[in-house]
Amino acid sequence: MEKIKIGIIGTGNIGTDLLIKILKIPSFEVNIFCGRRLESKGIGLAKSKGVQVSDRGIEHFINNPKCCKIVYDCTNAIDAIKHAKIFKDQGIKVIDLTPSKGGSFCVPSVNELKNEMNMNMITCGGQASIPLLYSISKHCNQLTYIEVVSQIASDSAGMATRLNIDNYIETTENAITQFTEVEKCKVILNLNPAIPQVDMQTTMFIKANSFDFEPLMGSIYNKIIELKKYIPHYELVMPPVINNNVLVMSVRVKGSGDYLPEYAGNLDIINCAAIEVTKKIYG
């Protein structure tokens, strides 16, 4: 079986964690791990594992247009938009792990985009909440408001995450609206500096005129089982509670400890989702 030739651009926390995960998959082959600084930790780790590296950023792909079949963009929301035009001209599929809104929103347990050339993985909070919000939206009447609050350990947030917080909020809100058809929503991201570091946790508040509770609960638990197939440390920590027509629930995501420690579930959830999309495309 021919291996899937993969490129990764962006060698920070997300890109490096993704690299380690992909190296464990026999059917994937990382042809290039590309950043801007040869002395970065991510590039150093990639070199130690025998992966070809470059510090030329997008220029590497311009000069080597056939170097991969699919590229994961782990840079930042602004650069990802610029990169997308280049990859489109080269016929390279893009899985965008930045909140750029440059491609079609993708949540692997909700929609399949096998024929799309550019898929946007939204955000960690989006991947944590949207599968459940989508399920809930099918079992309530007149859903009017959604609020999603995520907290992640400050130590798990790299430079790109900090630069992209406004993009994070806007992109997650837009994706929630797309998947639930609720216009009024609010997204909050808290970077928690506590020591010891906190796990990623996402709390959802859903307001509707009424909820069809039994089918809703069945739908939620079935969706969690589905999510755990590709996000093994995803768990419901506060089951749904309804008070005054507002449903509240919380999930927690631990990491696998591939690059950063287990508290960095925000890396795991978006990277595992990106890998799941790739498997569905080429499976």
PLM features per residue range, with description:
Residues 2-145, 149:
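N-terminal Rossmann-like NAD(P) cofactor-binding subdomain of oxidoreductases
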Residues 106, 204-208, 251:
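Short beta-strand element of the conserved SAM-dependent methyltransferase core
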Residues 140-142, 280-283:
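Short helix-capping/linker segments at secondary-structure and domain boundaries
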Residues 8-9, 13-16, 21, 36-42, ...:
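Metallocofactor- and cofactor-centric catalytic cores in central/energy metabolism, strongly enriched
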Residues 9, 122, 127-245, 257, ...:
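Active-site-lining helix/loop region of Rossmann-like oxidoreductase modules
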Residues 24-26, 115, 155, 246, ...:
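Generic signal for short, ordered secondary-structure residues
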Residues 109-111, 264-267, 271-273:
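Solvent-exposed, flexible loop/coil residues
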